[in-house]
């Protein structure tokens, strides 16, 4: 039984031919090299990925064991999302983490992520994964919160006001605009 918070050994996104789009491996600080899913080299990581892809390419299973690890996968368009954990991990928790990353990406991109979209928005992909998993610890599983942390805030005050108006009704918006204009007239900046 795993009593630590370190649930994730790796998060992978491979394309339909098994090539890397995104990979991130996590090494819990209390384990030594070679223990508990920690790979010693990129060559070992790629060998693991190739074998995993070959085993899962034609399967419809979402959860499986491979190389002594629990693997949860999700196929989306032309990419496959994998999350790898130890055999003692809760597969429902891992699946929820994987699904939340996929859903956060859908919220950000406004449609289902495919290979091209992921590569074009690689910076947002990296931030989504980092906001969800930190050193193998699952931090957040609510897609809307993850996406909100990734999106950029308003750049200027005018954009902030427009953003606020979208959230308010017409009368509230009118009142807010009236207050802002009055405030600027009194300051002499209008």
UniProtKB/Swiss-Prot annotation:
Superkingdom of the organism of origin: Eukaryota
Predominant location: cytoplasm
Entry membrane topology: Peripheral membrane protein
Gene Ontology biological process terms in this record: intra-Golgi vesicle-mediated transport; intracellular protein transport; retrograde vesicle-mediated transport, Golgi to endoplasmic reticulum
The keyword Membrane belongs to this UniProt entry's keyword annotation: yes
Keywords, ordered alphabetically: Cytoplasm, Cytoplasmic vesicle, ER-Golgi transport, Golgi apparatus, Membrane, Protein transport, Transport
Compartments, as annotated in UniProt: Cytoplasm; Golgi apparatus membrane; Cytoplasmic vesicle, COPI-coated vesicle membrane
GO CC entries: COPI vesicle coat; cytosol; Golgi membrane; nucleus
Binding partners and assembly: Oligomeric complex that consists of at least the alpha, beta, beta', gamma, delta, epsilon and zeta subunits.
Function of the protein: The coatomer is a cytosolic protein complex that binds to dilysine motifs and reversibly associates with Golgi non-clathrin-coated vesicles, which further mediate biosynthetic protein transport from the ER, via the Golgi up to the trans Golgi network. Coatomer complex is required for budding from Golgi membranes, and is essential for the retrograde Golgi-to-ER transport of dilysine-tagged proteins. The zeta subunit may be involved in regulating the coat assembly and, hence, the rate of biosynthetic protein transport due to its association-dissociation properties with the coatomer complex.
Family that this chain belongs to: Belongs to the adaptor complexes small subunit family.
Name of the molecule in the record: Probable coatomer subunit zeta
